[in-house]
Amino acid sequence: MEHVCFSRRIAIIDCIEFNERFRYSDTLADIAFLLMDLEYHGGKKYSASLWKHYRDLAQEAAVEPLLDFYKVYRAVVRGKVNSFQVDDPTISSADKDKAVQRAKKYFTLACSYAE
């Protein structure tokens, strides 16, 4: 959510500078990442609304199974990244506990998409 700015209009900043090919990835993968992030932060109704509008505008056929795959993947990656903090000696035990809670929440979310 740190790359979504709310002002007069919603602006989504996604600037991949290190690999030009990555800039042109599957749009559905990017939408799935944002949907997962919204749901993680309690914005399920916003996620549902965005998905409805995307689906109506993109007119892609039967992409829900692929959407769920991308959402599982992104949630697992976020959970994994948070899990890495547990072994970081520079992070306080309180911050490690928070990282564990975030990781659990991401892994639980991933499981919900896989059902």
Residue positions per predicted region:
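Active-site activation/catalytic loop segments of kinase-like enzymes and analogous catalytic loops
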Residues: 17, 24-58, 73-90
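Active-site acidic catalytic loop and adjacent metal/ATP-binding pocket
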Residues: 1-28
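In a subset of proteins, long, contiguous C-terminal domains/tails are tracked
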Residues: 2, 6-7, 69, 101-103, ...
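All-alpha amphipathic helical-bundle segments outside canonical DNA-binding/catalytic cores
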Residues: 60-70
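Amphipathic alpha-helix face/heptad-repeat signature
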Residues: 68-75, 99
